[in-house]
Amino acid sequence: SEETRKSYPYAFCLTLTYTLDADGKLHMNYKVKNTDTQTIHYQIGTHPGFTCPLEDGEKFEDYVLEFEKEENAGFHSYNTEKLEFDMTTYTKALDHSRVLPINYPLFANDALFFTDLVSKKVALKNPATGKGVEVAYPDFETIAFWTAAATEAPFLCVEPWNGSAIRSDEDNDFM
């Protein structure tokens, strides 16, 4: 649209395809086609939110993020005043572990932005019941997790990204 062209001056076609297979798996495919006469620059990511907790009587704190591989990783937090990820801070979250217990205080500084994970699959689940959701993100470089912690919202967003919001180690010049 003309409105989009004011802030993103490239011609492109974005196709999002959601397919539910016979096993009940939801596949989300994103295709960006350059319809311009020049190279286009872009970042893309997803922001799906999942109910957490799933069942009555459960708490948000009953859930964990379980990664497919053992991780030695941490995250950067979002600075809500500067509206950027603070790349000067790093919180070690996984010390040769696959499991990150979650709670609302963990999200007190907004999103958790992981840039150094080996895993390309993560499950949000209650280990006591085994119930939850698994997200595979083989074509994405990074992943973030977010909830509205201040209101103890009953969901967690699992956000695979190629690119991110502005980071403290870069300028705000997109092009």
What is each residue range found by the language model?
Residues 23, 33-38, 127:
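Short solvent-exposed strand-capping/beta-turn motif centered on an Asx-Ser/Thr pair
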Residues 16-18, 26-34:
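Short, well-ordered beta-strand segments enriched in hydrophobic/aromatic residues
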Residues 38-44:
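Short, hydrophobic/aromatic beta-strand segments
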Residues 39, 49-137:
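Active-site/ligand-binding surface loops and adjacent short beta/alpha elements
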Residues 1-23:
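Extended, loop-rich substrate-binding clefts of extracytoplasmic carbohydrate-active enzymes
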Residues 131-175:
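Active-site pocket scaffolds in enzymes
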Residues 27-29, 47-49, 155-161:
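Active-site scaffold segments
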Residues 18, 44-50:
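FAD-binding core of FAD-dependent oxidoreductases
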